[in-house]
Every structure is written in C-alpha cells, then in structure tokens.
C-alpha cells in the first residue's frame, strides 16, 4: 500500500506511479503448517483462560458487586498464568449494559460500571502467545434475555453460519463474505457499525 500523501507528492512532481499488488501481503495471508498448528494451540490455551474468567465473573455477579475494571483484571491475570503468554493482543474490553455497545470501549475510573445480572456483558480480548495470537469476542447473559436480544443474536448467528458455509473462488474478495455476514440483519433494517470479524495472525 502507498500512503496518500506520498501518492499526492508524486502527482505534484508529475511522476508516473505504477500500482501493483504487494507480494508480501499475499504471503502473509497464507498460513503455513507451523503457523496453523500454533494458531490452534494458542486458541486452545486461550479458550481455557477465558472460560475460567467467565466462570469466575458469573459466580461473582451472583454473590457480590463486580465492576468492569475488576473483570478486566481477572481476564488478564488468567492469561498471564500461561507459560507461553507474551502480552495482550490489545487492551481487554469488558462492557456491561450500554457500555458493551460502544465500539472499542475501555473502562476507566469515570466510566467503570457495576456488572448487573440483568444486563448483557461483552468481552472482547486476546493474547499474544509464543506460537499464536488470539482475538475473541463473547456476549454473556446472566439471566433470561428479552425477545429483541434473542432476535438480534439469532440474526448475527445466521450471518456467521452463512459466512462459515460459503463457497467461494480463489479470486473472490472478502467483500461478498462481509455482505453474507450482514444480510440477515439488513433484512430487518439493522446493521453493525464495525468490522465483521477479527484478523487471525501469528504472534509477531
């Protein structure tokens, strides 16, 4: 990719620019056998850490007051216990109720909200391990959800299944897959204002 300001500079000095695909990008998009194995291992151990965190959060919500910042600390601490853990993929996001709807929300002392069992609770987090990197999002309900929440979750799930079962050619771009992910929501005049899914990559 060429930054826009550099492209504009070449235009100003009237130099012709030939655009071509970056060969490195193609290599980066194709995982070799070592990367695939590492990715699977990293997701397995990360899943264990996240499952322990969610179990702890569900128990604490029912027995005592728990805040978003406390939940973030527990999630991060459980990842930190693994010997192959290197760092977080990005700062852990934990949003309760309306905070869960804020894209890339991060709890601060001012915004820190008590996690209520009547609200949906969103976790978006990941870890960098020596053999792979994770990025996982989970929406948790502590009690029975409303009809509207159930409907929205079902529409998102249908989009996920549509992408997972798509058959596409080698030359096809992600644009059509993105459309598949959103089509059931759009049928109900709904959408989401962020990317469809995370990037899967190897520990850098």
Residue ranges and their predicted role:
Residues 1-204:
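Active-site neighborhoods and metal-handling regions in enzymes and metal-associated proteins
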């Amino acid at each position: 990719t060429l930054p826009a300001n550099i492209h504009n500079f070449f235009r100003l000095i009237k130099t012709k620019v030939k655009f071509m695909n970056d060969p490195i990008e193609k290599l980066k998009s194709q995982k070799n056998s070592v990367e695939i194995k590492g990715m699977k291992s990293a997701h397995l151990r990360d899943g264990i850490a996240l499952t322990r965190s969610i179990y702890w959060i569900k128990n604490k919500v029912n027995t005592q007051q728990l805040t978003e910042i406390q939940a973030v600390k527990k999630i991060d601490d459980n990842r930190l216990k693994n010997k192959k853990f290197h760092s977080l993929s990005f700062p852990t996001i934990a949003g309760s109720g309306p905070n869960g709807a804020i894209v890339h929300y991060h709890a601060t002392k001012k915004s820190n909200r008590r996690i209520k069992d009547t609200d949906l609770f969103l976790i978006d987090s990941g870890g960098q391990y020596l053999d792979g990197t994770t990025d996982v999002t989970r929406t948790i309900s502590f009690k029975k959800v409303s009809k509207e929440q159930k409907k929205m979750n079902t529409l998102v799930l249908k989009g996920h299944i549509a992408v997972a079962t798509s058959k596409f050619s080698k030359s096809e771009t992600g644009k059509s897959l993105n459309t598949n992910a959103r089509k059931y929501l759009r049928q109900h005049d709904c959408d989401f204002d962020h990317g469809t899914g995370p990037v899967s990559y190897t520990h850098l």
